Amino acid sequence: STKNGRDSNAQRLGVKKYGGETVKPGNILIRQRGTKIYPGHNVGMGK
């Protein structure tokens, strides 16, 4: 038998809220690896 045959689930990264969309406090705007995009004024960054 082979030792391959495994695959991880997709990580669903990317932009979650686009310009003009209404957001509430706590909404996720972008999911990314590292800090490719930095938050602007009055926007926090978790983890």
Swiss-Prot record:
One GO CC annotation: chloroplast
Region (Disordered): 1-21
UniProt keyword terms in alphabetical order: Chloroplast, Plastid, Ribonucleoprotein, Ribosomal protein
Subcellular location: Plastid, Chloroplast
Gene Ontology molecular-function annotations: structural constituent of ribosome
Pfam family, one: Ribosomal_L27
Keyword Transmembrane: no
GO biological process: one example: translation
Gene3D superfamilies membership: 2.40.50.100
Family from the record: Belongs to the bacterial ribosomal protein bL27 family.
Name of the protein in its database record: Large ribosomal subunit protein bL27c
